A protein has these predicted regions:
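A short glycine/serine-rich beta->alpha loop
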Residues: 22-29, 94, 134-135
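Solvent-exposed coil/turn segments that connect beta secondary-structure elements
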Residues: 15-17, 26-28, 45, 63-65, ...
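Short, mixed-charge aromatic SLiMs
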Residues: 62-74, 163-176
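Active-site SXXK
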Residues: 18, 30-58, 97
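Envelope-exposed proteins and targeting segments
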Residues: 6-8, 17-19, 54-56, 141-144, ...
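A short, well-structured edge-of-sheet supersecondary motif
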Residues: 1-24, 197-198
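Short, Gly/Ser/Thr-enriched beta-strand-loop segments that form substrate-interacting elements
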Residues: 170-204
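Active-site-adjacent helix/loop patches that line small-molecule binding or acyl-intermediate pockets
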Residues: 62-63, 69-158
Length: 204
């Protein structure tokens, strides 16, 4: 069915049976904004543990765009590309990442919430994704992305709800589908990604 299969990577899991269908699902490639799922997962984990509150605020200083693994602030998103020293709530930052794929919001969360992708973050997300989640090079496999998306779904928190209403619901997995979809896209260069939970009966 798929021509030129070396240029694609597909991982599909039926969550109620654990059955998997895949093509090149262990092929590592530049994941772009799909890597932001790691930040969203970790923030939700800490929210569930009551270590964070949605009302918590973080200041947008120049430092948040300058640590290893930070996204280019000139990329996607609506928050000011230049540091404004304003405080942003955790709730608004998470919505900005999940719904607008905001690079600056990701950097603010990465700087403060994950402590610049420290060992605690890495250990937590690696365990959830069942592999090393690389926030520096942002190279991931379809299987890793799908596995972490399933973990976000299993958390059953605010994040999966935010991902169910995004700026990108008219494209990729959610395009022309009449069932709810929670998804995170990621584009860069020739890479066009999407990782999603499709709320449908099986088979779909």
């Amino acid at each position: 069915k798929y021509n030129n299969q070396e240029r694609i990577s597909v991982y599909v899991k039926q969550l109620d049976t654990d059955r998997v269908a895949a093509i090149n699902d262990e092929k590592s490639m530049y994941a772009a904004s799909v890597a932001k799922l790691g930040v969203l997962y970790y923030a939700q984990e800490r929210l569930s543990q009551k270590k964070l509150s949605l009302s918590d605020e973080y200041q947008y200083t120049s430092a948040v765009n300058g640590f290893p693994g930070a996204y280019d602030p000139d990329g996607s998103g609506k928050i000011s590309k230049m540091p404004d020293d304003k405080n942003y709530s955790l709730e608004n930052l998470l919505k900005a990442v999940a719904q607008n794929s905001d690079n600056v919001a990701t950097n603010i969360l990465g700087y403060y919430v994950t402590n610049q992708y420290d060992k605690a973050f890495q250990k937590s997300v690696d365990k959830a994704a069942a592999t090393s989640w690389n926030m520096d090079k942002k190279e991931l496999t379809a299987r890793a992305a799908g596995t972490l998306m399933e973990a976000v779904y299993r958390q059953n928190g605010d994040i999966i709800n935010y991902l169910s209403s995004t700026d990108y619901d008219g494209e990729r997995t959610s395009k022309n589908i009449d069932v709810p979809v929670a998804h995170k896209i990621g584009d860069a260069y020739d890479f066009k990604h999407d990782v999603a939970i499709v709320y449908a009966d099986s088979p779909f």
